[in-house]
Curated annotation (Swiss-Prot):
GO molecular function terms attached to this record: lipid-linked peptidoglycan transporter activity
Membrane-spanning ranges: 3-23, 54-74, 92-112, 132-152, 156-176, 185-205, 268-288, 310-330, 351-371, 379-399, 405-425, 438-458, 472-492
InterPro entries recorded: Lipid_II_flippase_MurJ/MviN, MurJ
Source organism (scientific name): Rickettsia prowazekii (strain Madrid E)
PANTHER family (alphabetical): LIPID II FLIPPASE MURJ
Protein name: Probable lipid II flippase MurJ
UniProt xrefs under CDD domains: MATE_MurJ_like
A single Gene Ontology CC term: plasma membrane
Subcellular location: Cell inner membrane
UniProt cross-references to Pfam families, sorted A to Z: MurJ
Native organism taxonomy: Bacteria, Pseudomonadati, Pseudomonadota, Alphaproteobacteria, Rickettsiales
Membrane topology per record: Multi-pass membrane protein
Purpose of the protein: Involved in peptidoglycan biosynthesis. Transports lipid-linked peptidoglycan precursors from the inner to the outer leaflet of the cytoplasmic membrane.
GO biological process: cell wall organization; lipid translocation; peptidoglycan biosynthetic process; regulation of cell shape
Amino acid sequence: MTLFRSGIILAFLTFIARIFGLVREQFIASLFGSTPMGDSMNIAFKLPNLFRRIFAEGALSSVFIPIYNEKMLISKKAANNFSGKVFTLLSLTLIVIIALMQIFMPQLILCIAPGFYAKKEKFELTVFLCRITIPYLIFVSLTALLGGILNSVKKFAAFAFSPIILSVCVIIFTLIFGNYIESTISISVSLIIAGILQVVFMFICVKKADLHFPIIFHTNDPDVKKLLINMGPATISSGVQQLNLFISQSISSFIEGAISILAYADRIYQFPLSIIGTSFSTILLPEMSKVYKSNDIVSAQKIQNNAIRIGLLLSLPATFGIIILSHPITNIIYERGVFTPQDTTNTAEAISAFALGLPAFILAKILTPIFYANGDTKTPLKITLFSIIINTNMNLLLMDSLKHIGIAVGTSIAAWYNLGLLYSYSTKQHKLHIEAGIKLFCAKILLCCTLMSIIIALIKHYYLEYLYSEYLLIKVSMLGSTIIIGVAIFFGTAYLLKVVNYDNSTK
């Protein structure tokens, strides 16, 4: 299966999962809006996922997959034994980490959201909810490991589907038990139930793929030692990346309602980021690992350039579209219950600011696996350390004048700086070879985006009353029609300019 086709299949499954995620966020936003309770709930929801990105999806996956592929070249049994050792070690490590976090949760929340400390009830509620949700870390991390195993053998569907379980659990559990216990507690408990179901589901998929492995505790194994040594820089790198979020969150905790606003905005701009960037990044790492192991440089360069072209082709129009339509999108998705029109405006502003960095976020997800596929975990760490300095300074500089928008703008500026460093280091180290035609390719896409934006802006201007109709069906139909017309204009123009060739997917 080609990179593009694999990416499209995974992107489609990610799209479905993100739709369910949006429904879940819509449900939570209608209950809490940007109230203090909403801020506490968003922190409790984010905390385990933040550490998951550091330990599981960040450091572990980037180091585990290349070694697992090496073992698979020897035999399936060798790969399964390696998986068993890593699974056991990860489980025991996470149990210790969760126990420590339960003890030091007040101190942890003080670091993540120092602005809450002056508001005793808000601070105590956040600590209480985080103590309920943090055990989800072990389940979601094991799910990520099992997903990495399946991704290594090009079985991407199960892991892409697993987030749907979380969204469905949160909604159903809260609807059933919301009348008997506090909504904040029912949502927090539903996270743990979802985590258990996700692990069970992934285990079933791994067994069906005949990749079942024994539970082995063996820290002296040379492959496990290699994993742990390589995980050092990778964990720091992933941790530093997440530290960007910690810092942004810490700063925003001093602005009432900003944590909730940024969380709701994050959910919408993460929609294309996950569908495009994460989907292709997930596929790229195992693909790149294999071609580098076989020393096939020509294939590696072809994969790199195809991925960059696809990333540009999809991220640039998404950026233009999101910026123009951020307000009606937010209105349709969130504005109900306690979520006010002012919340809609604030969230839309944050979405537009985040969207400015969308191409950089997506292209970074395409370039970063190039280093990990070569076994280089130190360069991404250096790049991330530089980026975090930019992110922190931008957030502090822009927060006073632009409030929550300043934090989102600072994040986008840091994303472009990060991409610039990734490009610079990868080309200097001869790991990336950009084809000469990509500059013209990018210019043509920008021309297509400009024409698309003009058409969308005109539709928005002349049919504004329908985009904000009191009837949901009319609003959704109008927004959907506008997006479809915009997509048709973009790809139609792209075809005329020979940006895309529908026989080969990308030219």
